[in-house]
Swiss-Prot record:
Residues the record marks as active site: S147, D248, H276
Enzyme Commission number: 3.1.2.-
GO molecular function, one term: hydrolase activity
Protein name: Esterase tropF
Key words, A-Z: Hydrolase
Source organism superkingdom: Eukaryota
Disulfide bridge map: none
Keyword Signal: no
InterPro entries assigned: AB_hydrolase_fold (IPR029058), FSH-like_dom (IPR005645), LovG (IPR050593)
Length: 306
C-alpha cells in the first residue's frame, strides 16, 4: 500500500486534470494478461519493476522470467506499465512483435515534467493497486528498471532524496510514493529526468559542475569557489546495484551514469558478459540475485540498528 493514502484515492487525486482522463480510462481498460504469481510470494517485500522504452509490462515480465524465478523466496516482483504510446524499441519486434501496445515512460525529450510525473504516479499506483487486489501484502521496498526504466528509477530515488532533505518528514503531503529502500538499475543511462522543481535545481547545479570541471576559463574567482560549486552536485545515496552488459553498445553511457550521479559508498557495479538485455543465464542471474539479497540484508540491518 502507498503511505498516507490508498492507491485508489491517490489515483483519484492525480486525475483531477482533464488532460489525463482519456489516457487513464484507456490504460485502465487494458489487461496485462499476466499469469497469477506464485501465491507463496504474496507476503514478501515487493520490488516495483519499470520496463524499457518501447516495450511494456508484459514484455518486461517475460524478460525478467529467470530473475523473478530466482528471487521468488525473497521478493515479489510487481510490474508497472508506462502510459505514453511508443514505437517498439530496438530488437523488440524480433521476439515480441505481437505483445503490443508498446509504451514509454518519457513522452518526448522536452516532455513537461508535471505531465510526466503525473503519468508515472498513475502507473505506479495502478501496478500496486492491482497487486494488492491479487492478495499481495508485502511492503514495496525497491525498484528494478531496465534501460529507460532504469533512468526513471534513478530519477525517482534522486527525487526521494531531495524531497526528504527539503521537507524532512513529508507524510503530510497529499500523495506519497513508497519509500524506495534500494534500486537495481540495468543498462541505465543519463541524463536523469526532472520530476519536480527540486530535481530542476539539482539538474542545473549538476550542469554547472560539469562545465566547471571541463572548462578552465569558468570565470570563477578562485579554486575555492570552484570547489564549492562541484560539491553542491547531488550524488544519489540510496543504495543501488548497477548492472552493465560488457557487450552493450552503450556501456560507456551506463558507466557514466554511475560515476556522475551516484555516491560510490552506497552503490555497486555488476558487469556481465552480455549485450543490451536482462540477464537470463543461470550464472549471471545467480550473481545478481546474490547481490540483491546482500544489499537488502544490509539495508534492513541498518534500519533495525537505526
Amino acid at each position: 500500500m502507498l503511505h498516507g493514502m490508498s492507491p485508489e484515492c491517490a489515483l483519484s487525486k492525480l486525475l483531477s486534470s482533464l488532460e489525463f482522463h482519456t489516457l487513464y480510462r484507456y490504460t485502465m481498460t487494458q489487461k496485462h494478461n499476466f499469469p497469477s504469481n506464485n501465491k507463496d510470494t504474496l507476503h514478501l517485500p515487493r520490488i516495483l519493476c519499470l520496463h524499457g522504452g518501447g516495450t511494456n509490462a508484459r514484455i518486461f515480465r517475460a524478460q525478467c522470467r529467470a530473475l523473478e524465478k530466482a528471487l521468488r523466496t525473497s521478493f515479489r516482483l510487481c510490474y508497472a506499465e508506462a502510459l505514453f504510446p511508443s514505437q517498439p524499441g530496438p530488437d523488440v519486434t524480433a521476439v515480441y512483435r505481437d505483445f503490443g501496445p508498446f509504451r514509454a515512460w518519457i513522452d518526448s525529450p522536452d516532455a513537461n515534467p508535471v505531465t510526466m510525473t503525473e503519468a508515472l504516479q498513475i502507473s505506479i499506483c495502478k501496478a500496486i493497486m492491482e497487486d494488492d487486489q491479487r492478495g499481495a501484502t508485502g511492503p514495496v521496498v525497491g525498484l528494478l528498471g531496465f534501460s529507460q526504466g532504469a533512468k526513471v528509477c534513478a530519477s525517482l530515488i534522486l527525487e526521494q532524496q531531495l524531497l526528504g532533505r527539503t521537507f524532512g518528514d513529508h507524510s503530510h503531503l497529499p500523495f506519497r510514493l513508497p519509500q524506495w529502500r534500494f534500486a537495481v538499475l540495468l543498462a541505465g543511462r543519463g541524463p536523469l529526468v526532472t520530476l519536480s522543481h527540486l530535481s530542476v535545481g539539482a539538474d542545473i547545479m549538476q550542469k554547472m559542475a560539469h562545465l566547471c570541471e571541463n572548462d578552465d576559463s569558468s570565470g570563477l574567482d578562485s579554486q575555492e569557489n570552484l570547489g564549492n560549486v562541484i560539491l553542491t552536485r547531488e550524488l544519489i545515496q540510496v543504495p543501488t546495484i548497477h548492472v552493465h552488459g560488457r557487450k552493450d553498445p552503450a556501456l560507456d553511457l551506463h558507466r557514466k551514469l554511475y560515476y556522475d550521479d551516484f555516491d560510490p559508498r552506497y552503490s555497486k557495479v555488476m558487469e556481465w558478459d552480455g549485450a543490451h538485455r536482462v540477464p537470463l543465464k543461470s550464472k549471471d542471474v545467480a550473481t545478481l540475485v546474490k547481490e540483491i539479497n546482500v544489499l537488502w540484508a544490509s539495508v534492513s540491518h541498518s534500519n533495525v540498528q537505526g
